[in-house]
UniProtKB/Swiss-Prot annotation:
Name of the protein described by the UniProt record: Glutamine--fructose-6-phosphate aminotransferase [isomerizing]
GO terms (BP aspect): carbohydrate metabolic process; fructose 6-phosphate metabolic process; protein N-linked glycosylation; UDP-N-acetylglucosamine metabolic process
Main location: cytoplasm
Catalytic activity, as annotated: D-fructose 6-phosphate + L-glutamine = D-glucosamine 6-phosphate + L-glutamate
HAMAP family (alphabetical): GlmS (MF_00164)
GO cellular component: cytosol
InterPro entries, sorted: GATase_2_dom, GFAT, GFAT_N, GlmS/AgaS_SIS, GlmS/FrlB_SIS, Ntn_hydrolases_N, SIS_dom, SIS_dom_sf
């Protein structure tokens, strides 16, 4: 959600800040703004509703001088999207300017107290309350900005990542975090600040990830200072970012989403590199081997995740239960954290998150840890909060995912879950050796089969034109394909704004069949694995009610192709690996329908890439 960028050094701040905001556009936003300490020591704030490009147009005739500044993209939580509610926010004296990502839960109480003391508010945001509170602490207690920030944050309930400028101390930025990510980049006589490393990698590969409760004091020409809310000095741990600048560009594709769909064969190969020994037909996840006893002796696994990651978790449940014979529960992290779950030291919790910053998933991890559970993380963003909070885990190594609608992260998560299940099953002795070797060999062939699927791009682009009229879609699948149906429906609704729902195919008769008529497209995953004959019966039921069937079938299928309105043939694979093949054409179908409808595919309305608030 909201993006934060900051700079202090010798260069002009504004171009760095604007470029940084553009790097963070993928996080989702509805307004943008910038605050600069100008060459003549003025604190200038400029902000607008809309895209970063609109902010650029707005400041054309403004004073954008200065080598110190902060900038922000806002995703509305308190107050509608408008320039008044956009960040940065001034304090009453206009000597302080603050940007904030997160939610101040007790803002209403704090606002009433400040209003009683004569403070006037221009916006309806919780962020303006925070900057006014900091100024109140600074003036009333006659303290410096750092102390005022510490005093104010000790009164705050909620999540925050903040950066603040003080006109009276133009050589300094104060930044702090709690339950919302913040990264400090360290350059040569300059510092960078951002919500994640993407705006920083162009300038430096040395970063410090702030921990919860830490405050960074960033001064020009001085060493980075990190303290906690009690002013105890911390030792910042400098890490190297492995991110490459080229990974953040479209590379000739019209959208990041299409690029990321086409990257999947290479991404899955990278995900498996060093983990699958092709010659020995063996899968080894070091995280499993290192904690073998804990994992093998677990009484159950609990997978916590949100959105697309939750769909991957459903596939993980099927894999682990089938291969390892360990019971698995899959929970929405947002529900798990609030329902007082029964959990103890005999449980293993698998936390899945692309960004590693998903607020509900992170909170679920902390809850499970507090009750003695062993935590295994599956994330993409290296150095993010969830990997730092877990006992062990596996990165999916698919590279940065910029498109808001997840594609390669999903298949990467499924790949890691497959390798996790296979490694555990072999260690546990619950999988037949012949079956194990067949799956490992087939898993190694998946990148090549994904490339075959991508050759269907033009056919799916043409097919999509037929269905732009639709207001509703139904997606059906059985077994491993049911979570794929859910994911396909989610992709369509996210980027095309067409209402779509996924169901287990057998559940169609328990309600959804009432919706089927000549205007209802039904996507059916009907590969020749497992329950093919039953899915065939479901298709016949749909056609009997004049529904439009788009069937994804195994290459060579001659039965369903005669019944369906359209059939797309896919390479054959083993049933448990079907999701890695069948997901890709559903991503392409959703993408092309959205493009045909003229939608903003990479930044769909109301959505954020990294959901860092509840």
């Amino acid at each position: 959600m909201c993006g934060i960028v900051g700079y202090i050094g010798k260069r002009k701040a504004y171009p760095i800040l604007i470029k940084g905001l553009k790097r963070l556009e993928y996080r989702g936003y509805d307004s943008a703004g910038v605050a600069l300490i100008s060459d003549n020591q003025q604190l200038n704030v400029y902000k607008t509703k809309g895209k970063v490009s609109e902010l650029e147009n707005f400041v054309t005739q403004k004073d954008i001088s200065g080598t110190v500044g902060i900038a922000h993209t806002r995703w509305a939580t308190h107050g509608e999207p408008c320039s008044v509610n956009a960040h940065p926010h001034y304090s009453s004296s206009e000597k302080l300017a603050l940007i904030h990502n997160g939610i101040i839960e007790n803002y209403a109480v704090l606002k009433e107290k400040l209003q009683a003391k004569g403070y006037v508010f221009k916006s309806s945001t919780d962020t303006e309350v925070l900057v006014q509170l900091i100024e109140y602490m600074k003036v009333t207690n006659r303290v410096d900005l750092l102390t005022a920030v510490q005093l104010a944050l000790n009164e705050v309930i909620g999540a925050y990542a903040i950066a603040i400028l003080d006109k009276e101390h133009p050589e300094e930025i104060i930044a702090a975090r709690k339950s919302s990510p913040l990264v400090v980049g360290i350059g040569e006589d300059e510092f960078f600040l951002a919500s994640d490393a993407t705006p920083i990698v162009e300038y430096t590969d040395k970063v410090v990830y702030l921990e919860d409760g830490e405050i960074a004091v960033i001064n020009r020409g001085k060493e980075l200072k990190v303290v906690d809310l009690s002013n105890v000095e911390m030792t910042p741990e400098v890490k190297k970012v492995e991110l490459k600048l080229g990974q953040l560009e479209k590379g000739g594709y019209p959208h990041f989403m299409l690029k990321e769909i086409f990257e999947q064969p290479d991404c899955i190969h990278d995900c498996m590199r060093g983990r699958i020994n092709v010659e020995a037909n063996n899968v080894v996840l070091s995280a499993v081997i290192d904690y073998k006893e804990k994992l093998l002796n677990a009484k159950r696994f609990i997978i916590v995740a949100c959105g697309t990651s939750w769909h991957a978790g459903l596939i993980g449940k099927h894999l682990i239960e089938s291969f390892c014979r360990i019971p698995v529960e899959v929970e929405y992290a947002s529900e798990f954290r609030y329902r007082d779950p029964v959990i103890d030291e005999h449980d293993v919790v698998i936390a899945i998150s692309q960004s590693g910053e998903t607020a509900d998933t992170l909170a679920a991890v902390e809850l499970a840890k507090s009750r003695g559970a062993f935590i295994y993380g599956i994330c993409n963003a290296i150095g993010s909060s969830i990997p730092r909070a877990t006992h062990t885990g596996s990165y999916i190594h698919v590279g940065p995912e910029i498109g808001v609608a997840s594609t390669k992260a999903f298949t990467g998560q499924v790949t890691v879950l497959t390798m996790l299940a296979l490694t555990l099953a072999r260690e546990k002795g619950t999988i037949d050796e012949t079956q194990y070797l067949n799956i490992v060999r087939e898993l190694n062939s998946i990148p090549g089969k994904m490339k075959e699927v991508l050759k269907l791009n033009d056919k799916l682009a043409e097919l999509s034109k037929t269905f732009t009229y639709a207001h509703n879609f139904i997606y059906l699948g059985r077994g491993y394909s049911y979570p794929v149906a859910l994911e396909g429906a989610l992709k369509l609704k996210e980027i095309s704004y067409i209402h779509a729902e996924g169901y287990p195919a057998a559940e169609m008769k328990h309600g959804p069949i009432a919706l089927i008529d000549a205007e209802m497209p039904v996507v059916v995953i009907a590969t020749q694995n497992g329950l093919y004959e039953k899915v065939l019966s479901n298709i016949q039921e749909i056609k009997a009610r004049k529904g439009k069937v788009i069937a994804f079938v195994t290459k060579g299928d001659t039965v369903i192709s005669k019944i369906a309105d359209c059939s797309i043939e896919l390479p054959e694979t083993i049933e448990c690996l079907d999701p890695l093949i069948t997901t890709v054409p559903l991503q392409l179908l959703a993408y092309h329908i959205a493009v045909c409808k003229g939608m903003d595919v990479d930044q769909p309305r109301n959505l954020a890439k990294s959901v860092t608030v509840e």
